[in-house]
């Protein structure tokens, strides 16, 4: 059942172009443990061996196998009520993260009921190793954040919920990018 959930979300992210074959990661919280995708796993074709169980607060034998973003997932679980996390690299949201301090659009409310989405790291001087805590802090008041030039982290009580925030944000960002490419909201645009 658990593997099926990870497979469904991973395949859906890949099929929508929100992750490449070895990018992005997924996790769920179970008590003081988390189950996270393995380092370098292919979200399109997850297998049982691609799921790693490890501690939220401490390392164990499985920790070296976990996604490289384990520290971010841990910080989010330690500082929020999230029970699931989806980290993806949606292209339009990532593009907008490079030029906006926050991503806002009427379409965000229409697609996923979101207000402005903060861009973590935009114009910030972050101490080395501190970005996980900065992301977790931003997720205390938001279900999803964009990370400057890197992608998004979405949270939910269920993985489907975090997935829906990810896809909703990307759909809204795609519309914003299309509007900008047509000159909407820019000098000379109508």
Residue ranges and their predicted role:
Residues 1-190:
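Glycine-rich flexible loops
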């Amino acid at each position: 059942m658990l593997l099926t959930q990870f497979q469904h979300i991973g395949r859906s992210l890949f099929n929508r172009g929100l992750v490449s074959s070895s990018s992005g990661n997924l996790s769920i919280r179970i008590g003081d443990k988390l189950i996270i995708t393995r380092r370098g796993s292919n979200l399109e074709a997850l297998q049982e061996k691609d799921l790693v169980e490890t501690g939220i607060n401490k390392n164990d034998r499985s920790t070296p196998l976990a996604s490289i973003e384990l520290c971010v997932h841990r910080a989010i679980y330690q500082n929020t009520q999230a029970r699931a996390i989806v980290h993806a690299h949606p292209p339009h949201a990532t593009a907008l993260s490079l030029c906006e301090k926050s991503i806002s659009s009427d379409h965000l409310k229409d697609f996923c009921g979101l207000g402005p989405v903060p861009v973590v790291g935009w114009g910030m001087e972050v101490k080395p190793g501190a970005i996980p805590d900065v992301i977790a802090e931003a997720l205390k008041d938001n279900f999803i954040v964009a990370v400057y030039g890197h992608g998004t982290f979405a949270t939910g009580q269920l993985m489907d919920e975090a997935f829906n925030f990810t896809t909703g944000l990307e759909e809204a960002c795609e519309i914003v990018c299309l509007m900008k490419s047509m000159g909407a909201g820019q000098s000379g645009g109508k």
